[in-house]
Amino acid sequence: GEILVHVITTSQEEHDLESLKEELLALPLEGKIVGIMHIINDSLSDVVQSDETRILYGQDFFYETLLGLRFKISTFSFFQPNSLAAEVLYSIVREYIGDTKDKVVFDLYSGTGTIAQLAASVADEVIGVEIVEEAVEAAKQNAALNNLSNCKFIAGDVLKVLDDLTEKPDVVILDPPRDGIHPKALPKILSYGVDHIVYISCKATSLARDLPAFLAAGYKLCLLYTS
């Protein structure tokens, strides 16, 4: 496979990155290094933020294949790092939503559109909503890469975008950030009254907070997968 290396430092120290680059390229790896990035991060945070990004070698992206589709992944794209586990997860999602060839699927908090594009192969239309504009542009590029014409990606807050959409979904897929679904967006999502909702949670406490609203709206918890 392809490997994109990120070297993260502060601007307060100098490093011999040329020697490091040569050492990395000489490593006997199973995959091929297609790019080495130098990310300067002076922020105090539990996530990497780029104050400046430089290409030391090659390119700033790589390609990953999931369930027959190809995705271009850049430095700050949101993408599941464990591709084998991601394939298991996405296969479960696709199997659960079932035959959707004549149906409209909403993928809310769609990131780079991975789930939306996997659903597009078994749906009439998929609409993805994501607040990060860079992720939406990546989703559009990947949809074109996979020759998918029935995907539409919208940049914006789910809370606001749902007010403007004229389409009505038959299936809703939710993959919110760690904080879960915005409390004001939940009633809008539930008002569609779709038969199937898939909630992919990356934080159990957020799921536990949101789940009672679904149960109160008449939904039943049919399947629960944990890892």
PLM region spans:
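Rossmann-like S-adenosyl-L-methionine
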Residues: 16-18, 22-227
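Helix N-cap motif at beta-to-alpha junctions
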Residues: 10-14
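Short, aliphatic-rich beta-strand segments
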Residues: 1-9, 70-74
